[in-house]
């Protein structure tokens, strides 16, 4: 394997690749052609590991980025996805085909959907309609014999005594794991801590149906804090060094959105008006949605974490498990 050893911390001289230190590289996987929406991470070493594949159309982007970092088709040891949503694992089957020696690691509750994504794709089609093809493409199966599952805890061997320890972190999804690097202290948080916009340092919840659950989401934030990571690596998007403050903000934002959604529901508003009211009452918290914000940035924020999706998840949770008034 030709490694990227000796390159600057900013990464190799390739757009979309950023070196983060400790042989960790952020890869912009360019969901639907957007920049800075979905990140994958490559950990170089004796056993190179890719965390998150992005969507199916992102697979060639990932392959080319790994090639630029010296990782050839038979060099990648492991592909890990934090959960099976299409912006994180939609490309798992395609990337696995491009790197035929890599095992694919996923929480046990998501494994069957990687092996046979038909039901997942059908559900996504109902939500996104024709936009599914543009946003996510078609998820292809991952051979079942190449899938390794983790449960409450798990380990990915990175070689040389280095490892990723997985920790079950539901709340956003029932098949979600966080992963902490034993050397760098980086914690890969997937969507469990929400969506981060590096341009404005905004942090907003990601609470889609059908799996959102307030108590487990807050429990995952507490668990993440107990791991005492050095840095958070968001799939949307990038590294955040202020760990304690960011996890506290994440918990605060989730609780605020639940509170506002409850209030709108208490006023007997229909779904569309609930979404509009929650958007109105929360938007001033986010610089990306301010009156002077760049419209493209605002559109990117809404693509990453739409108000309608998050409110729908909270409404589903409220309806499924009625809360005390």
Predicted feature residues:
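Active-site/pore-lining binding-face segments in mid-to-C-terminal subdomains
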Residues: 215, 220-279
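C-terminal regulatory/interaction regions
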Residues: 2-4, 263-325
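Metallo-beta-lactamase
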Residues: 5-6, 12, 55-57, 75-87, 113-170, 174-244
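Metal-dependent catalytic neighborhoods of phosphoester/phosphodiester hydrolases
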Residues: 90-99
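Residue-level marker for buried hydrophobic side chains located in beta-strands
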Residues: 49, 80, 104, 186-188, ...
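Conserved beta-strand hairpin/beta-sheet module of binuclear metal-dependent hydrolase folds
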Residues: 13-69, 73-75, 179-191
